[in-house]
Amino acid sequence: MHVLVISQYYPPETGGPQNRLLSLVRGIQAEGHSVTVITEKPNYPTGVIWDDYRDGGLIVDRTYEEVPVRYCWIWEDHHKTTITRIRFFLSFVVLSILASFRVKNVDAVVASSPPLFVGLSGWIVSRLKRARFVFDVRDLWPDVAIAMGELRPGRAARIGKWLERFIYRKAHGITAVTNSFCEAIRGDAPAATPIRRVTNGTVPEDFVVSESRESLRRELSIGSGFVAVYAGNVGLAQGIEHFVDAAILMRDRGIDARMVVVGDGAAKEAIVRRAATYEDLNIEFRSRVGLKEAARYMAAADALLVPLSATPIFTKFIPSKLFDSMAAGKPLLLSVDGESRTILEDAGAGLWYPAEDPEGLVDAIAQLQRAPAAAEAMGSRGRTYVAHHFSRESQARILVRFLEELTGQSRPDAVQPSQHQLKEAS
């Protein structure tokens, strides 16, 4: 079976979506099937195409971990306005379709959203290739955009909802990252369309760090005492401004604990600016780092923060940060209700507090401080639980079995295509 994966998120960019797609591709390979990836030229987080990918034309062919990858030009999104975002998304739709012309003998097309428009690419390419089309859903758009105030109810929202349902109708199968997503999609998709949960998951080995916590703290200069670390995107969806309020409370109450935020994003500048207006806050902001360095920060911590906005729709989400943080073997401070909270409590991997609630966060930090042995046990339970239930390897196998069902190819019968097999378009 030859699977064509279409996504706007893929290495060498780093991040949760990129890591998930890479793991799924590895899983397809591990089962003996072949894979080709079509993605955008790397541009995260600035929206500007990386220098190494500027030359070579509209489509650049590279190999990443022995998988042929076609990197497509996109309309660069410097300012992230509504117009530039639409141009950004639609340019990928057009270029990804063109890029598919050189990919031959495709049995299944997996289009991973967001953005929603990538589903349009997947459907059109699957028609051109006469292949099965699987729509992979990692975000409930436009519902999330409306809930976050990024999209007003009106014509644009109605068009977005129509497009979402259109893609669901055209898909031969749908995968989604949470049970809540599956339930929401079932209400909009045809009754006969099969839906599978393929969660974000983690690679536990990525979070095994040989250095001691003490040496890591010295090297990373994060101080002594109790340290809670957040390593990830600092966007509106994460809702981390309450970290500043929690730091104020800890200062005023004389609680000897600090928070270290490692990451960048749309909300960071305003949060840093607000924190700077207060004196003697035990909160520090650092720039984003790669996965290996993030794992070192996590290993140096006493606890790991896993927040999301208090916007109700986020109770349907399971942030990928949840699984990675559990794999790091540290107790979690989770502020996401719903499925995420259920996983945390089933694993006994940490403490939950209400989203964007600084009082709840401070109380949870104090509770872990008072019981270091119990906190350590939480971390150990979390690592064991996530390795058993949510490894990306196991999630990739779920996807492969689903693709085999849809294509009727239960056993591998294809070899990995080389760059030479990406034939010239006629």
At which residue positions do the language-model features occur?
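N-terminal subdomain of nucleotide-sugar transferases
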Residues: 1-65, 250, 415, 420-426
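Carbohydrate-associated surface elements
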Residues: 180, 201
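Acidic anion/phosphate-binding donor-loop and adjacent secondary structure
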Residues: 186, 192, 202-219, 239
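Conserved donor-binding/catalytic core segment of Leloir-type glycosyltransferases
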Residues: 222-238, 243-248
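Short hydrophobic beta-strand element within catalytic cores of glycosyltransferases
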Residues: 303-306, 324-335
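Conserved acidic donor-binding segment of nucleotide-sugar-dependent glycosyltransferases
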Residues: 346, 351-358, 367-373
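A short, well-ordered alpha-helix in the C-terminal region of glycosyltransferases
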Residues: 360, 367, 374-388, 398
